[in-house]
Regions:
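Feature primarily recognizes SF3-like P-loop helicase cores of small DNA viruses
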Residues: 2-194
Length: 194
């Protein structure tokens, strides 16, 4: 989460949270949005990542929050890699001249299902931290105000923990997460529609 507070893309990392509903993905999404503030996130969905007008909304944003993808949706690998890496891209606002931007927003992708990808190379998976949300909270045990409480009451502590974790990730070279993602490459490749 601390990487999402940085105004650079030098680590080339995005986050994909995966799991069936009722497990906290939307709480985390709300906390991330609360952490960066309403004016500092975009919400360009996967099917619009090739749209130059939509991509322009990511200019100077810390986070691009993708809230769901269809089970049969394809991961737009080239666009995802370019955004996560902060590559130069020409975008435009309506009725304005095109301009070049280097996005630095962290892609936060919350999904019930892993999207299919045409690119099963290391390049895409080296860029995505894939976090499993395996525990479904029974409806009677859910705190429907949890996200609101965390954002309103716990944000200073959350930001401190996020920045401390980011500093540790930088020191370790993000090594642990990279090993975790190797296992996901195998899982995703086995599910690939070849």
């Amino acid at each position: 989460m601390g990487y999402s507070l940085q105004t650079h893309a030098r680590h080339e990392k995005g986050i994909m949270t995966v799991g069936v509903g009722g497990n906290g993905k939307s709480v985390l999404d709300s906390v991330v949005k609360g952490m960066v503030g309403h004016d500092n996130f975009a919400a360009v969905q996967p099917n619009n990542l090739d749209n130059n007008f939509q991509k322009a909304t990511m200019r100077l944003k810390l986070v691009n929050a993708i809230t769901e993808s269809e089970q049969s949706s394809k991961l737009p690998s080239g666009h995802v890699k370019a955004i996560i890496s902060g590559e130069a891209m020409t975008v435009e606002n309506k009725r304005k001249d095109p301009f070049v931007m280097h996005p630095f927003c962290t892609l936060w992708w919350a999904t019930n299902h892993l999207p299919h990808a045409n690119d099963y190379s290391e390049a895409i998976y080296r860029r995505m931290f894939i976090v499993e949300f395996n525990n479904t909270v029974p409806p009677e045990k859910r705190d429907t105000k949890l996200a609101e409480k965390l954002v309103e009451q716990e944000m200073p502590g959350i930001i401190k923990m996020a920045l401390d974790a980011y500093a540790e990730a930088v020191r370790s070279g993000f090594a642990i997460a990279d090993l975790h993602n190797i296992a996901w490459v195998i899982v995703i490749a086995k599910k690939a529609p070849f």
